[in-house]
Amino acid sequence: MSGQNSENFIKMHGTGNNFVIIDSCSANDLNWNYKKIANQNGCDQVIVITNSSLADCFMHIYNADGSKAEMCGNAARCVGYLLMSEKGTEYITIELVNKRILECFKVGDKSIKVNMGKPLLKWHKIPLSTECDTLHLPIELEMLKDPVAVNIGNPHIVFFVDSVNEIPLQSLGPKLENHALFPQKINISIAQVEKSGEIALRVWERGTGITASCGSAACAALVTSTLRGYLTVQQTSVNLPGGKLLIEWANNVFMTGDIGFL
């Protein structure tokens, strides 16, 4: 990765989810102004790659507001592609916070599959500030109500609606992200399960706002759709404004999608 450009950072996207990726393996330097970098480059997250004793690299994730995130599936696909290209392999591992390890597989020219791990559904694992039924959270805001909560390496709630385009996510997102039920704030998804069995999805990402794509949100959408009984299969396409992700749930959740350079 270190030879990609003179400034030692790369601009990439995973289905429209935009990143600045900084290779800091040689220095293990995390002393960057992440909010400034995000503002100057118009990216959703800033990703810093450092060395890991447990995996091929350690991936640090910073939101557009400078806050840290625990998981970013789309960024993992981008980093996975870079490392696999550098190493000449079709499999690498990425370490995240809490010693979580993501497995990445090359399945096409620029198509990467990521093992996102097991979804967590207990209220204290989301986490929530008080004990609740995570399949039916007691939240109602304008036309949104009765969301499902799940942790896919980071906390998510999913609302099911008849039309994702009718929801004013720009105004509702900040209120839901900062709801008192979520001590670590929350990622918000608006999901529409279509007759075809595919899912249309719009996302408000914690610390960033509306994004064109969010890999962990797509995983959350499939898991919660299945738990609610809206889907009878455990594999489907999730259609986001930035593109399509294939999500599979077989004990662990797997996400497959394309990457690109900006």
Swiss-Prot record:
A Pfam family hit: DAP_epimerase
Positions of substrate binding: 17, 45, 63, 73-74, 154, 187, 205-206, 215-216
UniProt keywords, alphabetically: Amino-acid biosynthesis, Cytoplasm, Isomerase, Lysine biosynthesis
Name this protein carries in UniProt: Diaminopimelate epimerase
GO molecular function: diaminopimelate epimerase activity
GO cellular component: cytosol
Superkingdom of the source species: Bacteria
Family assignment from sequence similarity: Belongs to the diaminopimelate epimerase family.
Marked site: Could be important to modulate the pK values of the two catalytic cysteine residues: 156, 205
Parts forming coiled coils: none
Subcellular location: Cytoplasm
